[in-house]
Amino acid sequence: MSRIVSGEAQPFEPADRALRPQTLSEFVGQEQAKANLSVFIDAARGRGEALDHVLLFGPPGLGKTTLAQILARELGVNFRATSGPVLAKAGDLAAILTNLEPRDVLFIDEIHRLAANVEEILYPAMEDHVLDLVIGEGPSARSVRIDLAPFTLVAATTRAGLLATPLRDRFGIPVRLEFYTHDELARVLLGAAAKMGAPLDPSGAREIAARARGTPRVAGRLLRRVRDFAAADGAEVIDRKAAAAALARLDVDEVGLDALDRRYLRALIENYAGGPAGVETLAYAIAEARDAVEDVIEPFLLQQGFIQRTPRGRMACAKAYEHLGLQAPRNLGGAAPPADLFDK
């Protein structure tokens, strides 16, 4: 499901490598994480050692891949990248590990999707810098141990809770990335616009930031489309009015909800009296797959307090009624507390 407000990377989407920050000082947001990583990098570099293994986790689109690349650049070492789904066999990972040079950074995206047999050979590699392989089959099979160069594994996941405990415990530096504030996103947007040559002013940046769901990837995607509308309309500057008009044409409202989000909320409120309603029922009501409802639509609505999960099903909160301009039942409480969605 391709949505302009999705934090997930989309097929054929431009990578915007030229827009990415190159150093920690250029990286906007995540101040505590940056401060801690800077200390760890300086310490490892001063000792001439590999940085401890790093686990980057949190919602999609917050810059985990960019941060991994910056770590390698700040350490002055090579950067190798792969992903959990690509490493189908133990030999795939072994080929990468044996070609790493001392202190290199290996980045594995979506590490929660790593196959169990591949994960098993990662344990000794991370802990003891050795690779235990079985050569041959049957009675003639033998175990071979290969020494590896000390390296740093930087792994990224949106589902840290799916990692096996032995794997999670081997990361000496866990880093949770948080949603961005509107001010931080506005800074990201102004920097990106300058590099793109887009005539974005601060009021336009704040308007886009308010609808970007706290996610730089979404902000960048919205900026590209707003730039297109501004060029088509002959706008000399992208101010708040121009940005709002373009975003309205994209059907992204003032808090970042799109048509699919609103259709979900209306189905829950108008078809099922605000709930409780089961996820399967809601999926049928809006003609979407259950996985899409749970993984794509609901996370932001839960995080923002529009809906809540209960043992009996989904329920609309007062904020959902207010946003849609509907009268909430008198006995309905306020918004649900933000759900911790991304490490379950």
From Swiss-Prot:
This protein's UniProt keywords: ATP-binding, Cytoplasm, DNA damage, DNA recombination, DNA repair, DNA-binding, Hydrolase, Nucleotide-binding
Annotated positions binding ATP: L19, R20, G61, K64, T65, T66, R170, Y180, R217
Segments for region (Head domain (RuvB-H)): 254-344
Gene3D superfamilies: 1.10.8.60, P-loop containing nucleotide triphosphate hydrolases, Winged helix-like DNA-binding domain superfamily/Winged helix DNA-binding domain
GO molecular function, one term: four-way junction helicase activity
The protein's assembly and partners: Homohexamer. Forms an RuvA(8)-RuvB(12)-Holliday junction (HJ) complex. HJ DNA is sandwiched between 2 RuvA tetramers; dsDNA enters through RuvA and exits via RuvB. An RuvB hexamer assembles on each DNA strand where it exits the tetramer. Each RuvB hexamer is contacted by two RuvA subunits (via domain III) on 2 adjacent RuvB subunits; this complex drives branch migration. In the full resolvosome a probable DNA-RuvA(4)-RuvB(12)-RuvC(2) complex forms which resolves the HJ.
PANTHER family: HOLLIDAY JUNCTION BRANCH MIGRATION COMPLEX SUBUNIT RUVB, PTHR42848
Family the UniProt entry places it in: Belongs to the RuvB family.
Protein name: Holliday junction branch migration complex subunit RuvB
Species this chain originates from: Phenylobacterium zucineum (strain HLK1)
